């Protein structure tokens, strides 16, 4: 039976939150975690060029089956979360806004720390914006999320008068994902 390297990879990488590993590249965190666990690295399994899609072990065919301690390779990944808030007052006046947040990873490597199997992952990553950022935990999705809508009544300040009035507030959250995420199960050299 093959050795399970995942627990050692996860424990080591988790201990690096708030720190920079190696030269500070995203690759360094995964590579060092695998080496510390005694597993093979991308240098053992496949292309290692600056823009290569690294191979970190055995490919996991479905991300729902990825485990904590697996290595995640990104290619042209983008996650957009749009939160649309619409406020309707008794007189029919409507005010709304729709701010959005994006996570973009064109070519990136991370260590999976949680996978509840519902399209969400939590990863440990560094150099996530290309500025040698220290290791942190990030929640991402590997598939679009179902639209979530909540409706409440509450006091809201009107934009036109500046006065607070009771209003119906509808919040719609949409998450869309594009690009490729590939998980790899650590294995021996």
Regions picked out by a protein language model, each given a short descriptive name:
Residues 18, 35, 77, 128, ...:
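Residue-level marker of positions within ordered structural domains that often coincide
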Residues 1-44, 82-91:
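N-terminal capping segments
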Residues 42-133:
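...with weaker cross-activation on analogous glycine-rich loops/strands in unrelated enzymes
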Residues 17, 21, 45-48, 56, ...:
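Feature targets compositionally biased, intrinsically disordered low-complexity regions
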Residues 9, 17, 21, 50, ...:
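Extended aliphatic helical segments
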Residues 115-189:
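Active-site or metal-binding loop neighborhoods of secreted/extracellular toxin and effector enzymes
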